[in-house]
UniProtKB/Swiss-Prot annotation:
Highly expressed in skeletal muscle and heart. Not detected in other tissues tested. It comes from the Eukaryota. GO terms for cellular component: M band. Its main location: cytoplasm. Signal peptide: none annotated. Keywords: Coiled coil, Cytoplasm, Leucine-rich repeat, Muscle protein, Repeat. Component of the sarcomeric M-band which plays a role in myocyte response to biomechanical stress. May regulate expression of other M-band proteins via an SRF-dependent pathway. Important for normal contractile function in heart. One of its GO terms (biological process) is intracellular signal transduction. This is Leucine-rich repeat-containing protein 39. It is found in: Cytoplasm, Myofibril, Sarcomere, M line. LRR repeats lie at residues 84-105, 107-128, 130-151, 153-176, 177-197, 200-221, 223-244, 246-267, 269-290. Pfam families: LRR_14, LRR_8. Residues 10-47 form a coiled coil.
Amino acid sequence: MTENVVCTGAVNAVKEVWEKRIKKLNEDLKREKEFQHKLVRIWEERVSLTKLREKVTREDGRVILKIEKEEWKTLPSSLLKLNQLQEWQLHRTGLLKIPEFIGRFQNLIVLDLSRNTISEIPPGIGLLTRLQELILSYNKIKTVPKELSNCASLEKLELAVNRDICDLPQELSNLLKLTHLDLSMNDFTTIPLAVLNMPALEWLDMGSNKLEQLPDTIERMQNLHTLWLQRNEITCLPQTISNMKNLGTLVLSNNKLQDIPVCMEEMANLRFVNFRDNPLKLKVSLPPSEGTDEEEERELFGLQFMHTYIQESRRRADHQVNGSTTLPISINTDG
């Protein structure tokens, strides 16, 4: 009996020793594998960094990272070693996301990541207080973070052709230096309140959205000189549009406008308008032009057309007041 106990104890002791050895061996193998993976990562990071350094150029005194038509679905953390960069230009790289560490590039002035497959903008973007231009057109972005409003130096923001953006956070009205905004080819049904309240905005493109009407408060954009609203579903224009005294270019082609408000003749600075492809209820034609075919084409639904339309609209209104029932359908001065 005693011999059996001793034998069992010896076996257990040997088993325990072997289990410890096996456990230690597995731990050593795991550490070695992790170390090898770490070496591979370090090597890959160094290779990536070398490749990235080859893409750095200097133009007009700026340090620029320029990559085009090369596959970079993600950007390595080794990029942080190039924190002196002032401009990124990454086009058609298949980039899936803006790195979370983007906020550490405090010298960035221009961030151009257009024509990629980016689906979101990280909140860290708000740390780029020197950023003047953010160009993210032709991506797959759906929402814009409120933190973007912290980019106090931002002057130009382009989010065109993301298809699904339908609103902007109200905080973006705090972008006091923003003068240029491109929201074309998205999913907006109205002009966001944030846009209406941007104090310095001069140039706005909301073409190819789903706008049905313009708010009366559009007159708030007193510094706006260019407004693109082509290819929407706008049915009428507010009377307050005539209060936009600095507006020089207004494009309203391919909408559902049935009339041109008379008050628009008060817009003294208006130099270019386009009402082409709208179901306007009055049919008016212009006198023959002595200009080139290009000029004639441009003016066919342009400023002269607008003034002629308004004159005809006013003339018809006067006739109705005077009780006349025989009115011409159109103005035609072809001789």
